[in-house]
Amino acid sequence: MVLTARQQEELQLAVHAYLVEAGHAEAAAAMAKSANLGDDAGDAKYTGLLEKKWTTITRLQKRNMELQAEVEELRSSARAPRSRTTTKMEEWVPRPPATVAVDGHRLPITAVAIHPSFAVMASASEDASIKLWDMESGNFERSLKGHTNAVNDIAYDREGNRLVSCSTDMTIKVWNMDNFTCTKTLSGHDHTVSSVRFDHTGDRVFSASRDKTIKIWELATGYCLQTLQGHSDWVRSIDVSADGAWICSASSDHTVRVWSVASGECKHVWSDHEHVVEHASFAPLVAHEALNLMIFGSKPSAEAASKGPFVASASRDKSICLFDVSTGQHLARLTGHDNWVRATAWSRGGRYLFSVADDKTMRVWDIATKRVSKTIPAHNHFVSCIAVHAKNTHVVTGSVDLKVKVWECN
């Protein structure tokens, strides 16, 4: 891999800082002269940078070895005969206590996101910052600063190369995860921007706002391609289907809507909640089997089974609703929380739906039976957000208690 000119300069400055710190002043001076480092040599921000990069490489090498071992284990499992006693992935649920608990934000946590490949998590807060953490050790990595008011939502693209954020400052920012710089700021909403997502290609960003609209942005140009209107109040949450064809939205107008990305038309409006709808998300394909078991009571034939997509919504009416986009049906209402339900996330195996609420708990719902299978006292205050790692066994929650917690599933 060839370093860019800027990367070469940063490496030279980091080596220079290391030599100075190690007491090799003559070698440092000779290097500064040879490399023509100029006034940047001696800048305090480069002190310790070489050691940090070295430990990061070591950690990534270790993680790479672990992933290779996991792949080999999965291959061996695939070749081995199935056993009745083998714990299947669809049965994995979070187990207390949390394996990691970090704090560093000065105000409540509003959103969490997990890197799709690495053991890195991001947290957003009302303190206007985004922080990156090592999920396994809990070590703080860095802060992303640029917003001037509360950061309300964050999301990685599919590869984890970029992070998108939105804020009460009415802007959306796109961050490069290689150098942790803001590469694009999108402006156009007239009020708080409450939710953001990349599309499946990473070429577009979708945003929802208190100005009652949803916007579709082209990242290459920064232009707003389309504005979707229909909600009569604050649009609090959006999600994009896996194929990029649909958007679902949740609003303070008590409705959940599904929109066609191609046409911008609203396909369904569900008014089944009795209070503000805080969150809406699409079920992954792996959850369709459990959802069809719930619909039919037993496994349906391939022809009869609903192909979805399916939507889950969380509301201040203390309930979670499930919807079928293909039929427009309201499938079920899940009740059990004792306070506002803030967010949901699907288990990797698809059998369970996880939810967090102002009753300070995380609950695990068996979708096929529509019952709570586990209640976990998660935080000491309202639990505001949840995310599930796409490739390993971690669940992350964030809270008004200023803590981000990592939970192991088994």
UniProtKB/Swiss-Prot annotation:
InterPro entries: Dynein_regulator_LIS1 (IPR017252), G-protein_beta_WD-40_rep (IPR020472), LIS1_N (IPR037190), LisH (IPR006594), WD40/YVTN_repeat-like_dom_sf (IPR015943), WD40_repeat_CS (IPR019775), WD40_repeat_dom_sf (IPR036322), WD40_rpt (IPR001680). The keyword Cell cycle applies. Pfam families: WD40. One of its GO terms (biological process) is establishment of mitotic spindle orientation. GO terms for cellular component: centrosome; cytoplasmic microtubule; kinetochore; microtubule associated complex; nuclear envelope. Its main location: cytoplasm. Belongs to the WD repeat LIS1/nudF family. Positively regulates the activity of the minus-end directed microtubule motor protein dynein. May enhance dynein-mediated microtubule sliding by targeting dynein to the microtubule plus end. Required for several dynein- and microtubule-dependent processes. Dimerization mediated by the LisH domain may be required to activate dynein. This is Lissencephaly-1 homolog. It comes from Monosiga brevicollis.
